[in-house]
UniProtKB/Swiss-Prot annotation:
Organism: Azoarcus sp. (strain BH72)
One GO biological process term: lipid A biosynthetic process
InterPro entries, alphabetized: Glyco_trans_19
NCBIfam families recorded: lpxB (TIGR00215)
Enzyme Commission (EC) number: 2.4.1.182
Keywords, ordered alphabetically: Glycosyltransferase, Lipid A biosynthesis, Lipid biosynthesis, Lipid metabolism, Transferase
Cited function: Condensation of UDP-2,3-diacylglucosamine and 2,3-diacylglucosamine-1-phosphate to form lipid A disaccharide, a precursor of lipid A, a phosphorylated glycolipid that anchors the lipopolysaccharide to the outer membrane of the cell.
Record's protein name: Lipid-A-disaccharide synthase
Lineage start: Bacteria, Pseudomonadati, Pseudomonadota, Betaproteobacteria, Rhodocyclales
Keyword Transferase (UniProt): yes
Molecular-function annotations in GO: lipid-A-disaccharide synthase activity; phospholipid binding
Gene3D superfamilies in alphabetical order: Glycogen Phosphorylase B
GO CC terms of this entry: membrane
Family annotation (HAMAP family): LpxB (MF_00392)
Length: 391
């Protein structure tokens, strides 16, 4: 009988991650079947999506509260199906607020519940690890310091590395990126990444534009690249430019192309998030910044454990790149921090060395290692050839 795996992936990033995992499992167990909540990339791998993963996309606490009844209903319906169909295993990909409850119920029903992508318990709300220990059969972690946290709590855990480290080259081709973007090799370039969400562009757009204007006064030859992934964020940034007379800035908006923009840049101004990790894997000097509502910032600060918010600093356990958050996020301070990377090649070279070491530590062939951690829970695992993985 073919092994069956139920899965839930939240949002587009989870859809991509899960699709790679499905492919890696199928390479070892060709007749494996998958069903649950997923997106188009999972469906392209033969996944039976009973609900689309876009339904799980919530933006902030207010949206989550408004949609609680809808999401709770979907979760209960899926749980009923899993209990009835009894797959060999369940894999929750990210979306911890949705998946951990589900995983606890599924584990209690005697079905292995695996969670792929550890919640950021090392950054805030560390008490969640008790709930995780009750809810999951195994945790698959992306960062090398995470397994120790789970081992101390008695949670079976596997370190699988980060998929971006597999995708990004160890030595980015800056010249090729500049050629694709039609930028002269000798020109100074700063990439501005104010975030992927509309709320982030609203909060940070004008700040980034004012910072660019200040830096352009000091370095008239600089070119600013602003990659924006959606029409909505592009319109918001264009409106901010118009309000701040940004038409005179040497600035080019790109539709997507964030990786090319960062690869081509001498320095990056980036909102805290996954983009900061991408910049580190591309070995780019950066300044990390963020602004949010005052009450939200106070709440986050009270619940946080680490002195840093950016993944590069957290992963290196050191303040390698400047972080200017909330009241410290001002155009003069941001311009000063960016300028350092434009005029100090020795500091940039030292940073490249540290980021290269980080890249090596995260490059683990994530999909294969994750698949190897899942295979022992499948009914046909005895007949497949798992890739060796350290737990």
């Amino acid at each position: 009988m073919a092994p069956r795996i139920a899965m839930v992936a939240g949002e587009a990033s989870g859809d991509l991650l899960a699709s790679h995992l499905i492919r890696a499992i199928r390479a070892r167990v060709p007749d494996a079947e998958f069903f649950g909540i997923g997106g188009p990339k999972m469906q392209a791998e033969g996944f039976d999506a009973r609900w689309p993963c876009e339904l799980l996309a919530v933006h902030g606490y207010v949206d989550a509260l408004k949609r609680y009844r809808e999401l709770s209903g979907i979760r209960k319906k899926l749980l009923k199906q899993v209990r009835r169909e009894r797959p060999d295993a369940f894999i929750g990909v990210d979306a911890p607020d949705f998946n951990l409850w589900l995983e606890g119920k599924i584990k209690a029903a005697g079905i292995p519940a695996i969670h792929f992508v550890s919640p950021s318990i090392w950054a805030w709300r560390g008490g969640r690890i008790k709930r995780i220990a009750r809810s999951v059969t195994r945790m698959l972690c992306m960062f090398p310091f995470e397994p120790e946290l789970y081992e101390r709590a008695g949670v079976p855990v596997s370190y699988v590395g980060h998929p971006l480290a597999d995708v990004f080259p160890l030595e980015p081709d800056r010249a090729a990126a500049r050629e694709r973007l039609d930028i002269a090799p000798e020109r100074k370039v700063v990439a501005l990444l104010p975030g992927s969400r509309q709320s982030e562009v609203r909060n940070l757009g004008e700040l980034f534009i004012e910072t660019a204007a200040m830096l352009a006064q000091r370095h008239p030859d600089v070119l600013f690249l602003v990659p924006l992934a959606t029409r909505e964020t592009r319109e918001l940034f264009s409106a901010a430019l118009a309000r701040n007379k940004g038409d005179e800035l040497p600035l080019r908006m790109l539709f997507g192309h964030a990786v090319d923009a960062m690869t081509a840049a001498d320095a990056v101004l980036v909102a805290s998030g996954t983009a900061s990790l991408e910049a580190a894997l591309l070995k780019r000097p950066m300044v990390i910044t963020y602004r949010m509502g005052k009450w939200q910032y106070r709440l986050m600060k009270r619940m946080a454990y680490l002195p840093w918010i950016g993944l590069p600093n957290i992963l290196c356990r050191e303040g390698l790149v400047p972080e200017l958050v909330q009241d410290d996020a001002t155009p003069p301070k941001l311009a000063d921090a960016l300028e350092r990377w434009l005029v100090d090649p020795a500091a940039c070279a030292a940073l490249t060395e540290r980021f290269t070491a980080l890249h090596h530590s995260l490059r683990q062939n994530t999909a294969e290692k994750a698949a190897a951690a899942v295979l022992p829970y499948l009914s046909s695992s005895a007949s497949c050839q798992p890739v060796s993985v350290s737990a």
